[in-house]
């Protein structure tokens, strides 16, 4: 039996394919927007940001890193209930308001 014949018999269900297609953008967005681990060097923590809206119920904490010698722009990092961290795009109007309020306090 050839390998092609074996793989023809292993067809995933349409529901499974649809689920994979629906989850793929979310996984890519979260992994691409993850803050880099800090190793003490003077650089921005957030290399890539996410502009997608995240429901406030999913966020456990927000951290604002002010602009300074390490990075020219303020950074907004959300920690989600599942423990993952996402760098949020500070140009999104909602996130601009959050940064302004946090920097004023």
From Swiss-Prot:
Signal among keywords: yes
SUPFAM superfamilies: Interleukin 8-like chemokines
Glycosylation sites: 31
Signal peptide bounds: 1-29
Compartment annotation: Secreted
Annotated keywords: Chemotaxis, Cytokine, Disulfide bond, Glycoprotein, Heparin-binding, Phosphoprotein, Secreted, Signal
Sequence similarity: Belongs to the intercrine alpha (chemokine CxC) family.
Record protein name field: Platelet factor 4
Gene: Pf4
